[in-house]
């Protein structure tokens, strides 16, 4: 089981095939997605990699987090997430995952936070049909109607579909096909829509209901930081 990645949704566009057909795609960007920590069976009871993405200002990072980034020798990150892996696919700390971690044609599962739409009625939130236009109905054409029984059961059951807040929920979309990858710019183009708004964080994993292509690199595609690179600002802040 390989590690997933954290990506930032940039928006949607389309790409054309050789036959002239266009494919709607969502553009996901890997902005310095690095391994910042490990979870091991001996210490934590499970095996996982902790990834970070983005560039956070040192003043906005807590002292404990600055120390964590200093140990990993990476700059402070905006977003952190864990991905369960096997012992054989545990990536080294400091490794930066590149866009060709996923191969063209493979299927991925994406997870994000859906767009918030505020308070919504039952017709928009649950696709209710609404009440009749005439025949005694007035004012309440878009209402949800009855919510329960009479004296028995004498209550409205929990989880009844009613008006309320719509969106801002964790949503996973399965089996989206990778159309293109751009290693230099760190872009992954997946076919179809991805949950969330532009600028939101998206978790991308190998599809659990599809076979992993033989071309997919194991344990993953990444590049290591330069041995002679200068220490990150987080190191100085942690020591101070």
Curated annotation (Swiss-Prot):
One of its GO terms (cellular component) is cytosolic large ribosomal subunit. Keywords: Methylation, Ribonucleoprotein, Ribosomal protein, RNA-binding, rRNA-binding. The keyword Cytoplasm does not apply. It comes from the Bacteria. Pfam families: Ribosomal_L3. Residues 138-158, 215-240 are annotated as: Disordered. InterPro entries: Ribosomal_uL3, Ribosomal_uL3_bac/org-type, Ribosomal_uL3_CS, Transl_B-barrel_sf. Methylated by PrmB. The modification N5-methylglutamine is found at residue 151. One of its GO terms (biological process) is translation. GO terms for molecular function: rRNA binding; structural constituent of ribosome. The keyword Nucleotide-binding does not apply. Part of the 50S ribosomal subunit. Forms a cluster with proteins L14 and L19. One of the primary rRNA binding proteins, it binds directly near the 3'-end of the 23S rRNA, where it nucleates assembly of the 50S subunit. This is Large ribosomal subunit protein uL3. The gene is rplC.
């Amino acid at each position: 089981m390989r590690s997933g990645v954290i990506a930032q949704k940039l928006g949607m566009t389309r790409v054309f095939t050789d036959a002239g057909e266009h494919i709607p795609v969502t553009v996901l960007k890997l902005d310095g997605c690095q391994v910042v920590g490990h979870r091991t069976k001996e210490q934590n009871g499970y095996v996982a990699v902790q990834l970070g993405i983005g560039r956070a200002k040192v003043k906005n990072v807590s002292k404990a987090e600055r120390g964590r980034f200093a140990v990993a020798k990476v700059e402070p990150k905006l977003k952190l997430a864990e991905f369960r892996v096997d012992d054989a696919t545990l990536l080294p700390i400091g490794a930066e995952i590149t866009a060709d971690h996923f191969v063209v044609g493979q299927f991925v599962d994406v997870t994000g936070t859906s767009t918030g739409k505020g308070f919504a009625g039952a017709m928009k939130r649950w696709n209710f049909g609404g009440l009749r236009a005439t025949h005694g109905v007035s004012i309440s054409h878009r209402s949800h109607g009855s919510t329960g029984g009479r004296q028995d059961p004498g209550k409205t059951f929990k989880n009844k579909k009613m008006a309320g807040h719509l969106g801002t929920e964790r949503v996973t979309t399965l089996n989206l096909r990778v159309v293109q990858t751009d290693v230099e710019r760190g872009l992954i183009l997946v076919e179809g829509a991805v949950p969330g708004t532009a600028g939101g964080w998206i978790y991308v994993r190998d599809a659990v209901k599809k076979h992993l292509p033989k071309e997919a690199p194991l344990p993953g595609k990444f590049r290591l930081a330069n041995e002679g690179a200068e220490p990150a600002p987080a190191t100085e802040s942690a020591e101070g």
